[in-house]
């Protein structure tokens, strides 16, 4: 069998922000995701060097990018930037990109860190990676709702 099937794919999830990009890793077979790292979004060169290093290390089969929306589902000021980031990932690294509605990911991430008693600076530093985990987990949960084609 050549390559990983969609059922056991390794995935990287991204929560794109102007200052920071949260990254999570997940597996389609186990349907689980975990926060990985936060990349400072200093400039395009730094951003893609850091992403390239992660791709070399984790060798994902596909990427998931959170798409920020307003609560009513209309585009957010960050929607276009996140979409551009996903398109650049696809163009640069040749991996398929799926977008996931990330409307409540930061709220959920904040609550998850609070539940685990992560406080202060540690919470602030982990928040973006945890938001990426929430986004990726949402995608994985959708996979089990209707098996991946």
UniProtKB/Swiss-Prot annotation:
Subcellular location, record wording: Cytoplasm
Classification via Gene3D superfamilies: YqgF/RNase H-like domain
GO terms classed as biological process: rRNA 5'-end processing
InterPro entries membership: RNaseH-like_sf, YqgF, YqgF/RNaseH-like_dom, YqgF/RNaseH-like_dom_sf
Protein's UniProt keywords contain Endoplasmic reticulum: no
EC number: 3.1.-.-
Keyword ATP-binding belongs to the record: no
Pfam families: RuvX (PF03652)
CC terms in the record's Gene Ontology section: cytosol
Domain of life: Bacteria
Keywords: Cytoplasm, Hydrolase, Nuclease, Ribosome biogenesis
GO molecular function term, any single one: nuclease activity
SUPFAM superfamilies listed in its UniProt record: Ribonuclease H-like
Role description: Could be a nuclease involved in processing of the 5'-end of pre-16S rRNA.
Alphabetized PANTHER family for the sequence: POLYNUCLEOTIDYL TRANSFERASE, RIBONUCLEASE H-LIKE SUPERFAMILY PROTEIN
Family membership: Belongs to the YqgF nuclease family.
Protein name as annotated: Putative pre-16S rRNA nuclease
Provenance organism: Burkholderia ambifaria (strain MC40-6)
Lineage: Bacteria, Pseudomonadati, Pseudomonadota, Betaproteobacteria, Burkholderiales
């Amino acid at each position: 069998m050549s390559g990983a099937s969609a059922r056991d794919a390794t995935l990287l999830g991204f929560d794109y922000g102007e200052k920071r990009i949260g990254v999570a890793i997940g597996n389609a077979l186990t349907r689980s995701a975990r926060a990985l790292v936060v990349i400072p979004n200093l400039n395009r060169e730094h951003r893609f060097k850091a992403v390239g290093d992660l791709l070399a290390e984790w060798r994902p089969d596909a990427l998931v990018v959170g798409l920020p929306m307003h609560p009513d589902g209309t585009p957010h000021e960050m929607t276009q930037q996140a979409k551009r980031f996903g398109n650049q990932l696809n163009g640069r690294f040749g991996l398929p990109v799926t977008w996931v509605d990330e409307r409540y990911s930061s709220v959920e991430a904040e609550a998850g860190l609070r539940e685990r008693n992560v406080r202060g600076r540690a919470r602030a530093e982990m928040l973006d990676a945890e938001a990426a985990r929430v986004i990726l987990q949402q995608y994985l949960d959708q996979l089990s709702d209707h098996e991946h084609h």
